[in-house]
Amino acid sequence: MVQGCTSNAGKSYLCAALCRMLSDEGLRVAPFKAQNMSNNAGVTPPESSAPGLEMGRAQLVQARAARVVPDVRMNPVLLKPEADTSSQVVLLGRAAPELTALPWRERKPRLWPFVKGALHSLLDEFDVVVIEGAGSPAEVNLRPSDIVNMRVAREARAAVLLAADIDRGGAFAHLLGTWHCLMPEERALMRGFILNRFRGDASLLAPAPEWLEEQTGVPTLGVVPWLNVALPEEDGVAVEAPAAIIPSPSTGFVAIPRLPRVSNLDEFAPLGELARWVTSPQELAGARAVILPGSKSTAADLAWLRATGLAGAVTRLAVQGVPVLGICGGLQMLGQTLSDPQGVEGGSAASGGKVYGLGLLDLHTAFAADKTTRLSEVRDPETGLRLQGYEIHHGQTRSGPGVQTLVPGLLWRSGNVRGTYLHGLLENSAYLEHFLRWADLPVPACLDSLDARLDAIAAQVQAGLSWDRVRALL
């Protein structure tokens, strides 16, 4: 099990690497994370025993690394933030409104049996289960209701590796402090420390790892280098400094408004340094294209766009001929009207009245209680490309006479403005190339596939670990 001293310590990357490394040895491997809090979700594929169900993108990627079919048991609980103090609960791939309505501390006793059941079924079915923790196990206030860190480790009798992000500084204090906050029976499960995202000469770390082992009895089992390889992100922590897989051009970029309730932001990782997250009209200067991303609270984020002046600025760019792409919630914002007669979003449109969109596409969206979750593969008649992606939305959208429907219910166009419900478009390398050419941006000579990136990450992580000692923990 990989735990971290903090959020964004690199747990997801390390787990993906371990899944690929162990799969390379011929073992049947499954990833597992009891609970994710993220709006970066995907859906299980048709070959899954239960297709079309939601789970965290990190575990979807880890399943790919392990070369197994994704299964919602790998991420039994998914919390999708809707506001500062509320989250939608997705249990075993399906929205659970009865749990969403409960206070946080009352949910946990009801969730644990599902977590425990999913964990043990995977342990029975696979040779190895690579478990990812969440945040930090040292949050003393969360210990009584823990269902994702040390309670899972105890249940699985897992060997725990604790990772710290050394690039941020204070890694040895983080590791020692986390260890001190654990209960004695939890410390007994701690089998190694990992210094993650290191840049420079590892010999300069001496004698700190030896000192740390003297203090705790826990050895440092790896110094993993900074990995400049992009994987889909679990949450929004890394938005401020996205990993790059495409060189930054001297001029021009793709502007993406940093909506307060942005969802599925991981799908923009293929843009690398070409992506620039913006929060003001001034930051749009020089943009070659604009993408309006998905949102968990579309009407509220549309109001934010207007309050910041970005709505008007994006509209002006569209009128000037700059390519604009809206994805899911972004598609809905580009339309004429949004209505929420059932109060599905619980926000600005909850009264059932209409909210007016940017009017760049002649589309009208009504939110419905039933959620669409499915993988889709369609042919784009405009480009001739086969597009693969996934849908996760409550909106039902109808078109007016002023928009061209490219794929019914999925893809629309009006001049230089396009909208789609299909997440993951840019993860299709052929479409990414088309998009970059459309935006008059440079197309790199080679776009690495996800499997190639997973292989690269696994090789670098294995080189940084004392792999024989880690492997012996199984």
Curated annotation (Swiss-Prot):
A molecular-function term among this protein's GO annotations: catalytic activity
Pathway the protein takes part in: Cofactor biosynthesis; adenosylcobalamin biosynthesis
Listed Pfam families: CbiA (PF01656), GATase_3 (PF07685)
Coiled-coil residues: none
Occurrences of domain GATase cobBQ-type (ranges): 251-431
PROSITE patterns reported for this sequence: GATASE_COBBQ (PS51274)
Active-site residues annotated for this sequence: C328 (nucleophile), H423
GO biological process annotation, one example: cobalamin biosynthetic process
Keyword entries, A-Z: Cobalamin biosynthesis, Glutamine amidotransferase, Plasmid
Cited function: Catalyzes amidations at positions B, D, E, and G on adenosylcobyrinic A,C-diamide. NH(2) groups are provided by glutamine, and one molecule of ATP is hydrogenolyzed for each amidation.
Family from the record: Belongs to the CobB/CobQ family. CobQ subfamily.
Name of this chain's protein: Cobyric acid synthase
Gene: cobQ
